[in-house]
Amino acid sequence: MDPISKFLVSYKIPIGAWGKAFFTFLTDNFNTVLRAFSNGLNFLLDGMVDGLLLLPPVLLIALIALLAYVLQRSKGLALAVFLGLLFILNQNLWKQTVETLVLVVAAAAASMAIGVPLGIWAAHKPKVYRIMLPVLDLMQTLPTFVYLIPVLTLFGLGNAPGLIVTIIFVIPTSVRLTHLGVTSVPKSIIEAGEAFGATKRQLLWKVELPSALPTIMAGLTQSIMLSLSMVVFAALIGAGGLGTEINRALGSRRIDLGLEAGLAIVVLAIVLDRMTRIGVGGKK
């Protein structure tokens, strides 16, 4: 090794040691609070799953198909949703699918609840967005497995850490697309609102957000798809659902189980994508 390389290696920046010290500090001083939060979140998620599983599967499938029709006004879509979910039930993966559905919906809802206000704020404050941008890039490019270690350390095993990891992974998408939607509103529309004496609050709620809604809804769809892509990773830290079946199939080399669970994830992804997409079934 050349002298310069030796020097650089000898004086390694202790990033790992700093990170370990930081998380050790958190666990030593806030472990009770963090575990209480995790247990509360686990209780809430488990309660949602148990509540949905109390319904007969066919009834719940019919209700989801009805919701698809209400959202998109498409009988064909409602029928496709009904048949797709019946296929999952036929594969004896209904309980796991409900667990995954709860995790995905909760993660997408939380990411939108956090990301949309941040995106609106960033759209009105360019300096804020310039500060956010490297953080968002880091959140999206950091390997998923790196998220699992600190979250597992802080929150333990269960659905709660799986949900937290998924939210962290998904938030950048909702922030970016909300920012894109608001900044893409034509200035002529905003100027027309100002000419009629609209306040900043009125401009936001009656001009900017309605114009940006298609892009924001695209952010919701992307958030759902990204949340689904995380189910296998979330299962590694105790989250249930279809990801657990995928990991079981991988560990035991069971092609049959992997194919069944994989197809169930695909069907669920298509169902959620079509139900939340603007413009399906003629809806505008």
Language model region names:
Residues 66-70, 88-95, 107-136:
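Transmembrane-helix boundary motif in ABC transporter permease subunits
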Residues 1-102, 109, 282-284:
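N-terminal, non-cleaved signal-anchor transmembrane helix
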Residues 153, 182, 227-268, 280-284:
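Glycine-rich helix-loop "coupling/hinge" segments at transmembrane-helix boundaries
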Residues 103-106, 111-114, 123, 137-169:
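Generic hydrophobic transmembrane alpha-helix motif, especially the helices
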Residues 164, 168, 200-234, 256, ...:
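Transmembrane alpha-helices
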Residues 42-53, 94-102, 106, 129, ...:
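Alpha-helical membrane-interface segments at transmembrane helix boundaries
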Residues 174-219, 246:
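Short cytoplasmic-facing helical segments at TM-TM junctions of multi-pass membrane proteins
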Residues 96-100, 120, 131-134, 177-184, ...:
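Membrane-spanning helices that line or support transport/gating and their immediate boundary helices
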